[in-house]
Amino acid sequence: EGGWSGFPSHKHDTDRLPLETRHDETYNFRFKPSHGSGVQMLQREDGKSGDAYHLVDGSTICLDSGYHPCAVLPGYQMYYFTILGGLSQRSLVQYFQPSHADQLETIPGIKDMIAKFK
């Protein structure tokens, strides 16, 4: 309940192996209870402000570029279904935002999750 997803912030908008692959991503969000809400952040460049989108139950968002973590309000649960459309034939390789990449060492299980995308 409450918290962040997609953090450390990452992107996958450029084919430049072995660092990153190009995959567009579509999310459909659900909240429990259904009157809950959240926010989808979109930051196109590290160190510069970006956009934020208010999410409600049933929101769908399509992302083709930028770092994109999301968060849910405290006391609510957020579920999402995501579809990745690869513009190359390779598995997903996420590029983590340099200013937050050190968090990869502090979040239990994150490296195991990343390994499953390959």
Which residue stretches match the model-derived regions?
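Active-site region of the double-stranded beta-helix
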Residues: 1-57, 72-118
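Histidine-centered metal-chelating micro-motifs
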Residues: 60-61, 65-70
